[in-house]
Amino acid sequence: MAKKSIIAKAKRKQKFAVREYNRCPLCGRPRAFIRKFGICRICFRKLASSGEVTGVTKSSW
């Protein structure tokens, strides 16, 4: 888990736009962020398997 201070720091508006980066609002993870859904891959997988993300179906072939 990310430190609370780092999460709080990322939420604030940065002095320069280049310093802003995406962070998962559920767990605070900065990497593997899926822009379309606004969460990280781990939270996405958890929510998709429980059926909480609309329009996502498990593929099978």
Curated annotation (Swiss-Prot):
GO molecular function, one term: rRNA binding
Entry's family note: Belongs to the universal ribosomal protein uS14 family. Zinc-binding uS14 subfamily.
Listed name of the protein: Small ribosomal subunit protein uS14
A single GO cellular-component term on record: small ribosomal subunit
Keyword Acyltransferase included in the entry's annotation: no
Matches recorded under Gene3D superfamilies: 30s Ribosomal Protein S14, Chain N
Lineage: Bacteria, Pseudomonadati, Thermodesulfobacteriota, Desulfobulbia, Desulfobulbales
PROSITE patterns named in the record: RIBOSOMAL_S14
Role played: Binds 16S rRNA, required for the assembly of 30S particles and may also be responsible for determining the conformation of the 16S rRNA at the A site.
Annotated residues for binding of Zn(2+): 24, 27, 40, 43
Pfam families assigned to the protein according to its UniProt record, in alphabetical order: Ribosomal_S14
GO biological process, one term: translation
Cofactor: Zn(2+)
Keywords: Metal-binding, Ribonucleoprotein, Ribosomal protein, RNA-binding, rRNA-binding, Zinc
Record text on cofactor binding: Binds 1 zinc ion per subunit.
KW Acyltransferase (keyword) present: no
Subunit structure: Part of the 30S ribosomal subunit. Contacts proteins S3 and S10.
